[in-house]
């Protein structure tokens, strides 16, 4: 996506937000509403299933990853996306762009 497209998505996610906490909540909402779950990706060379998205107490956005009976939260800014990425992954890219 282009810088302009990412900026437009960021603007859409944060349009009614007054501070960084509300902006993070806006991105969380857009990711939850648009990202097609579950999907499989590779984290540290291991295939995991991304099952859900959560907002941490520090307002970072987390992906709930599972393999077998083990679950681990991974910050979406650190989450490798598969090729092709799932529908709605542009919101993760916009969040990464917004964070700088």
Region roles according to the model:
Residues 46-54:
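Short beta-strand-centered aromatic/proline hotspots
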Residues 13-16, 89-100:
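Long, low-complexity intrinsically disordered regions
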């Amino acid at each position: 996506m282009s810088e302009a497209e990412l900026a437009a998505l960021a603007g859409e996610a944060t349009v009614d937000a007054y501070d960084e906490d509300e902006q993070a909540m806006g991105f969380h909402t857009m990711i939850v509403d648009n990202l097609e779950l579950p999907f499989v990706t590779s984290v540290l060379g291991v295939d995991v299933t991304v099952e859900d998205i959560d907002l941490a107490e520090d307002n970072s956005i987390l992906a709930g990853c599972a393999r077998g009976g083990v679950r681990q939260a991974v910050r979406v800014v650190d989450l490798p996306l598969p090729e092709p990425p799932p529908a709605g992954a542009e919101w993760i890219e916009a969040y990464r762009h917004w964070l700088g």
